[in-house]
C-alpha cells in the first residue's frame, strides 16, 4: 500500500512540474489537486505502517 502511495505521489509531482511550467497549463489545477490528495494518502499510509509494527 505504501508503495502505491509513493508511486502516485511521484506521478503527481511530475504532473505538477509540467503544469506549473506552462507545458500543460490545463493540467496545472488537476496536478495541484492530485498532489495534495496523494500527499495525504502518503502520510496516512506512512503513519499506519509505523504504528502497525
From Swiss-Prot:
Keywords linked to the UniProt accession: Cell membrane, Membrane, Transmembrane, Transmembrane helix
Localization per Swiss-Prot or TrEMBL: Cell membrane
Membrane topology: Multi-pass membrane protein
Stored InterPro entries: DUF1328 (IPR009760)
GO cellular component: plasma membrane
Transmembrane annotation, as ranges: 5-25, 30-50
Disulfide bridge partners, by residue number: none
HAMAP family assigned: UPF0391
Assigned protein family: Belongs to the UPF0391 family.
Name of this chain's protein: UPF0391 membrane protein Bxeno_A2958
Lineage of the organism: Bacteria, Pseudomonadati, Pseudomonadota, Betaproteobacteria, Burkholderiales
